[in-house]
From Swiss-Prot:
This is Large ribosomal subunit protein uL3. Signal peptide: none annotated. Part of the 50S ribosomal subunit. Forms a cluster with proteins L14 and L19. One of the primary rRNA binding proteins, it binds directly near the 3'-end of the 23S rRNA, where it nucleates assembly of the 50S subunit. GO terms for biological process: translation.
Length: 235
């Protein structure tokens, strides 16, 4: 069963730039507009069988929301959101529907995993898609230098095995880059500066969450302690 805490935010990748650290070394960073996210549902072991929190992000025209989704948002008392994500965390009981989350849930030096949809490359050959070496430049090879070569035997096995790497559409898949470090947090503008590159194009949706292969963060402050701080989002 779940035994650790997670923190996460949905955001938009704005692009890459470079900054200087305390030792005047250039650091390449990706700028992510993190949040604001709003809690749209809290799941507990008693009601749902597991502990999780559902976050909403992005504005959407209420007229484009179907009735089931409209009722879901009305139950939480929040305006409709374009994107939803569920984050399993042991401290889900400390959240409350309508609570607003910003980049302040992370701090500089935090190690995170960033998930997004990679850039689509279109139809690609095996050398670009899978890193094949290709065929030789000589020894009778003619106009087949970027070919995959043999894909199977003749009479035995007499077929092509499932999963054989071939040419095809490359990219535009859900991808996670693990173990990235947050260089800085701009709370005034809601920016996260993440060292290195993250998946997806500029303007793409990304999920920033606590690194799965690092020690778990401390539990978030209980929702009762946040009352009166202006974190309630009305419908």
């Amino acid at each position: 069963m779940l035994i650790r805490n997670y923190r996460g935010l949905l955001g938009t990748k704005l692009g890459m730039t470079q900054v200087w650290d305390a030792n005047n070394r250039v650091v390449p960073v990706t700028v992510i507009k993190a949040g604001p996210n709003v809690v749209t549902q809290v799941k507990t072991p008693d009601s749902d069988g597991y502990s999780a929190v559902q976050l909403g992000y992005g504005e959407v025209d209420p007229r484009k929301i179907n009735k089931p989704a409209r009722g879901h948002f009305a139950t939480s008392g929040v305006t409709p959101r374009r994107h939803l994500v569920e984050l399993r965390t042991a401290d889900a009981g400390n959240y409350r529907p309508g609570q607003e989350l910003t980049g302040e849930v992370f701090s500089a030096g935090t190690v995170v995993d960033v998930t997004g949809t990679s850039k689509g490359k279109g139809f690609a050959g095996v050398m670009k898609r899978h890193g094949f070496k290709g065929l030789g430049a000589g020894h009778g090879v003619e106009r087949k230098h970027r070919s995959p070569g043999s894909v199977g035997g003749c009479a035995t096995p007499g077929r092509v095995f499932k999963g054989l790497r071939m040419a095809g559409r490359m990219g535009h898949v859900r991808t996670t880059t693990s173990g990235l470090t947050i260089h800085a947090v701009d709370t005034e503008r809601g920016y996260l500066l993440v060292r290195g590159a993250v998946p997806g194009p500029d303007g793409g949706l990304v999920l920033v969450r606590s690194a799965a292969k690092r020690p778990a963060p401390e539990a978030i402050a209980p929702a009762a302690e946040l009352a009166g701080t202006g974190e309630e989002v009305s419908a």
